A protein has these predicted regions:
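N-terminal periplasmic/intermembrane-space "pro-region" immediately following the signal or transit peptide
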Residues: 17-95, 304-312, 320, 453
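Short loop/turn motifs that connect adjacent beta-strands in outer-membrane beta-barrel proteins
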Residues: 22-25, 54-71, 107-114, 150-153, ...
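Extracellular/periplasmic loop regions
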Residues: 26-51, 246-247, 284-396
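Transmembrane beta-strands of outer-membrane beta-barrel proteins
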Residues: 70-80, 116-120, 156-160, 197-201, ...
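Structural signature of outer-membrane beta-barrel domains
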Residues: 78-82, 115, 122-126, 160-164, ...
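Surface-exposed loop and membrane-interface regions of Gram-negative outer-membrane beta-barrel proteins
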Residues: 81-100, 109-152, 166-172, 209, ...
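Signature for the C-terminal beta-barrel architecture of outer-membrane proteins
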Residues: 149-155, 168-322, 380, 392-408, ...
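Predominantly the C-terminal beta-signal and adjacent terminal strand-loop region
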Residues: 415-448, 452
Length: 453
């Protein structure tokens, strides 16, 4: 109860805010990003612009001719309070805990050379039955890389977070307490309006103690991600020596080819993405796919200036066990809260329909209301969580309906650097969950305070 009271006093949220809702400074500060390394503060070389806001002297510290230092920090406290988690089947179905994390960073520029360092201090209080390394990693190096700018080519090597497109396959895992980082190298090539990122990475495996994170020896990611205005096209290769499918553990090599169209026309906006996967796992052929659509319209002349959006996702599952083929889609390293603040199910073997409305109440307050419905794509396959772990096997059930969910969020941008938010979610079980195990309604209250500059 004490943890809940403390968290309530800290209120907060990770609700993404549209650009129009962000409070922009007089000197047109860049939008703060999750990764932080893609923010450009070089315009503050002008001392008059630095003087417009108290953060100016921190964002641009001149060190000499053509050299400067940018600094910043994120301080987040988040409480999550579950009742009947995993429909009552979790080890601790009624769990209430608080996450604390600090993410300071320093970004040094010397001519065409750059060094970026971001440590993390992350602790958890009250996680049952025990905090995992995603809840608590204590003190660690989250990001640390060197970079050289060769004009149209930028080369980078070291540890870094990755955010590709909408993070359908490669994301930062920002919602949980410990984000995901990768060790490796990356080259960004710019040709006119086109940009191509070529990368070879291994994910960082967090440990429960300080400075014990390690580069994964089992998983690897490589590929190329190209962007044009309103169009992304990419290839991603993936290897996992300890993959698990159908109770079998072995070596998985999977290739993903994706195409994404996105843009805005007047009051309308869209985001449509398709991915096909092929490869092999222990002598079995991989053939999987997904299609995700998002179409929305903003209505700025109505009260609250609402934006109505409909999202539909279809993600393949295995069609028949033992047939020599694996149709189960692998989302690789997806974003942390995939379908919403409460996301017990992940983007594998699923059909998801998600209408939502968001708007503004004035005074820096934003809200959103969402409904979700989930079905199994294939009745021969089960239900998975976001990392891709099987959480409910098919158990012979032919029911497709997994369940329905409702969610409400509210966020207040109290100052340009401080946001408070809250969310409440409820997930009612459908026929498949009712036929295969515990089937209680999950509820989750999330409270968050996030200060960053």
């Amino acid at each position: 109860m004490l943890r809940f009271v403390i968290a309530a006093g800290l209120l907060a949220g990770t609700i993404p805010m549209p650009a129009s809702a962000q409070q922009r400074e007089a000197w047109q500060a860049p939008m703060l990003s999750i990764t932080r390394y893609d923010e450009d503060w070089s315009d503050l070389a002008d001392a008059d612009k630095r003087a417009h806001h108290w953060t100016g002297p921190f964002k641009y510290i001149p060190l000499g001719d053509d050299s400067w230092l940018t600094t910043g920090v994120e301080l987040r406290a988040r409480s999550e309070n579950y009742h009947d988690n995993l429909w009552g089947g979790a080890d601790a179905p009624d769990d209430s805990y608080v996450w604390f994390r600090a993410l300071p960073y320093a970004d040094l520029h010397v001519g065409k050379v750059r060094a970026f360092v971001q440590p993390i201090v992350a602790y958890a209080v009250g996680v049952s039955p025990a905090a995992s390394p995603i809840d608590q990693t204590r003190a660690e190096l989250l990001q640390g890389f060197g970079e050289i700018d060769l004009g149209s080519v930028t080369l980078r090597a070291g540890r870094q977070m990755l955010s590709l497109g909408t993070e359908r396959l490669v994301g930062t895992r920002y919602g949980p307490n410990v984000p995901l980082a990768f060790d490796g190298a990356r080259a960004d090539v710019t040709i006119g309006h086109a940009k191509i990122s070529v990368l070879h990475m291994r994910p960082v495996q967090p440990g429960p103690g300080s400075f014990d994170d390690a580069t994964s020896q089992d998983k690897a990611l490589w590929g190329a991600y190209g962007t044009l205005p309103e169009l992304d096209i990419y290839y991603l290769g993936y290897r996992n020596r300890l993959a698990r499918f159908g109770g079998q553990v072995g070596r998985e090599v999977r290739h993903s080819i994706g195409l994404r169209s996105h843009g805005v026309r007047g009051d309308w906006h869209w985001n449509v993405e398709g991915v096909t996967q092929f490869g092999h796992f222990e002598g079995q052929r991989i053939a999987a796919w997904t299609v995700g659509t998002e179409i929305g319209r903003s209505l700025p002349t109505l009260p609250t200036a609402p934006d109505a959006t409909l999202r539909v996702n279809v993600v393949s599952g295995d069609s028949r066990a033992g047939d020599g083929k694996i149709n189960t889609f692998n989302a690789l390293f997806p974003k942390g809260k995939y379908f919403g603040e409460l996301s017990p199910v992940g983007p594998t073997n699923i059909i998801n329909v998600n209408p939502r409305v968001s708007g503004t109440l004035g005074g820096g307050v934003l809200f959103s209301l969402a409904a979700m419905a989930y079905w199994r794509h294939s009745v021969a396959d089960g239900v998975y969580d976001i990392p891709g772990n099987l959480i409910r096997p098919p158990n012979g059930s032919t029911a497709q309906f997994i369940g329905k969910e409702a969610e409400a969020t509210i966020a207040w941008q109290a100052t340009p650097a401080w946001e408070l938010s809250a969310s409440f979610s409820a997930f009612g079980p459908g026929a498949f969950i009712q036929e295969t195990g515990p089937a209680k309604t999950i509820t989750m209250l999330g409270l968050e305070s996030n200060f960053r500059f």
